[in-house]
Regions:
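Core catalytic lobe of class I
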Residues: 1-262, 267-270, 288
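Acidic, low-complexity intrinsically disordered tails
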Residues: 276, 280-288
Length: 288
């Protein structure tokens, strides 16, 4: 099966052409609730989950970003149903339940602002690739660590301490205190809308843009260079673009021909500027 390619078809048709254990990482934000009817198309999410399990490599990861709609004053629970489906029906492990906190929330008159979405990180057994991102510590945290003193001992060349008791046990905590960064939490705050999600104006022709930074950070976290990244609901093409920019291969499925035209423009502009070695093609034939 050809990679670095967008397939204009149902993702089940695309995955049917993939051998077992083919994909390293899937990053996607599927249509949900009433959006399940997507530009006139409907999706069988249970079979999608099962096929994703089949085509994912051992240790591979699926990042599934989803939210709930409120219907008749009650949230639909789509997010939780999805997590149960992937674990109990498809066979994935739920490796982490992460939160995407949006800095631009929509107001509501009867409840607090809904400013987050779930990011379920499913894995096929233990993840084979984990590159945890780091961020700067807060000013308060840095001040607290500066005021802390280590256990008595002799300072070593690498900055750590050696216990006085002669056990040769190095105090890693002391060395870690000198570090001004820490591993990020599983709550990621990202701006969205306007020029925050992307600077590609054509992408805004899609009703729900996947933020580039969000796709970028998951791709870095759960894959390595030259790995294969898949998005079964490619939308405006963000996952493919960020895979290219991070020197990963990609495959995308997008059932809407209208949205495929958006993807084609974004990928060609990105590929021509950064990675001329990547050849992007749109396919309207299921067998190509």
């Amino acid at each position: 099966m050809e990679v670095n390619r967008i397939y204009n078809e149902n993702c089940l048709d695309t995955m049917a052409k993939m051998p077992e254990g083919f994909v390293d990482l899937t990053v996607t934000s599927p249509p949900y609730d009433d959006l399940r009817t997507y530009n006139g198309y409907c999706f069988d999410f249970e079979n999608v989950a099962r096929e994703l399990f089949r085509v994912t490599k051992q240790g591979g990861v699926v990042v599934w970003v989803v939210n709930d709609k409120t219907v008749n004053y009650c949230e639909t629970l789509t997010s939780f149903k999805t997590a149960i489906l992937f674990v109990e029906k498809a066979g994935f492990n739920l490796h982490d339940t992460m939160i995407y906190q949006r800095t631009c929330a929509f107001p509501d008159v009867v409840r607090y602002y809904q400013d987050f979405e779930y990011m379920f990180v499913f894995s096929k057994r233990k993840p084979k690739t984990v590159n945890l991102l780091r961020q700067m510590k807060t000013e308060g945290s840095l001040k607290r660590q500066k005021n802390k003193t280590g256990v008595g001992g002799e300072r070593q060349k690498d900055g750590s301490l050696k216990r006085i008791d002669g056990t040769n046990a190095f105090l890693r905590k002391e060395k870690a205190r000198q570090d001004e960064t820490r591993v990020k939490s599983n709550v990621w705050e990202l701006p969205r809308g306007n020029q925050n999600s992307t600077k590609d104006k054509i992408a805004f022709q899609h009703p729900a843009i996947f933020p580039e930074q969000l796709a970028n950070d998951h791709i870095i976290s759960w894959s390595n260079e030259n790995d294969l990244i898949y998005d079964p609901f490619m939308g405006s093409g963000t996952t493919a673009k960020m895979a290219m920019l991070n020197n990963r291969k990609y495959i995308g499925s997008e059932i809407s021909e209208e949205y495929c035209k958006i993807i084609e423009t974004r990928i060609k502009e990105c590929g021509g500027l950064f990675f001329n070695s990547f050849q992007t093609e749109l396919s309207n034939e299921a067998g190509t």
